[in-house]
Amino acid sequence: MEPQKFGEAPVAMDMPPKVKKGKKPSRKIRALLALIIPIVIWLCLFLVFPYLNLFSYSFWKAGPFDVIKEFNLGNYQKFFSSEHSADPTFFVLLDTLKLALIVTFFTIILSFPLAYFICFKVKRFKQSLYILVIIPLWISYIVRAYSWKIILGSNGILNSFLIWLGVTDQPLDFLLYSQVSVTIAMIHIYLPFVLMPIYTSLEQIPRTLMEASKDLGGNRLKTFWKVVFPLSLPGVISGGTFAFVLSMGDFLAPTLLGGSSSSTMIANIVQQQFGTSNNWPYGAAIGVIILIIVLIVLKVTGSAEKRYSNLDSV
């Protein structure tokens, strides 16, 4: 650098550029991460990893004493070939699907009038009656299922009442330890799960729409079919999905009230494979198949619910 001459203006020296320090995340971002990270960890530990483990098990095979970690499709071949073999698993799945549809249908049929009555006909004790309907959810599942043994048994309340009326001379044996008892118990147990979303949908219907329908000459029946029912369909679909999915995975009701091969459900087969049969890979394969069916149902019902939810904006 040349020395500065006398009388010349001082020359500005080039300063090195300032290094910008990285900005620290704002307080909002840190608070958001503090909320999201625990949720992600929880989902990974209790949802993602278990399902990945189930999926990997389904491609292994059971050995004499332990699981052999060799990739094969034998478990899935065994399941889908059970239609033509002595293994009843495929037919049990079909029976489970049929029973789940029956339970879903009757829970909707019974829940809708009750939810409609509480929502539109009860004025003073609406909340009290609603709480009374969902109180069974606070009672143990086993207690609710076992109570039907007392009601449907040979010396139970229903048979004693029918004999007293003179309808029959002896107890009706088909009421207990059959598919009838399993179906009745499951309808009773899952009824609150269907009623709650239906009631919520009915409560959200603007009363002005119903009044407008009446002003335009619509009677009660026409108002119901043209206004109330279409706007309540999201709740009906949501409740029906609850009933179907829960019915697909139920194994306690068939165990306590079934007592025969005709009332065995697919969840009982899975329980048996992980229990007495000690064939975890085959049980995992059945679990994956059930999971795929449930995901398909959730996709279809979710699309339908979204479609009918758009009616609110029409």
List where the protein language model places each region.
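Interhelical loop and adjacent transmembrane-helix boundary motif
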Residues: 27-31, 63, 75-85, 248-251, ...
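Short membrane-interfacial helix/loop motifs at transmembrane-helix boundaries
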Residues: 47-87, 151, 155-156, 258-261, ...
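Transmembrane alpha-helix signature in integral membrane proteins
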Residues: 86-120
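Non-cytoplasmic
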Residues: 50-57, 145, 150, 194-197, ...
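Transmembrane alpha-helices
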Residues: 37, 41, 45-47, 135, ...
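Membrane-interfacial helix termini and adjacent extracytoplasmic/periplasmic loops
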Residues: 73, 145-187, 221, 254-262
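N-terminal signal-anchor/first transmembrane alpha helix
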Residues: 1-53, 117, 127-133
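C-terminal transmembrane helix and the adjacent membrane-cytosol boundary/short C-terminal tail
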Residues: 2-10, 14, 199-210, 214, ...
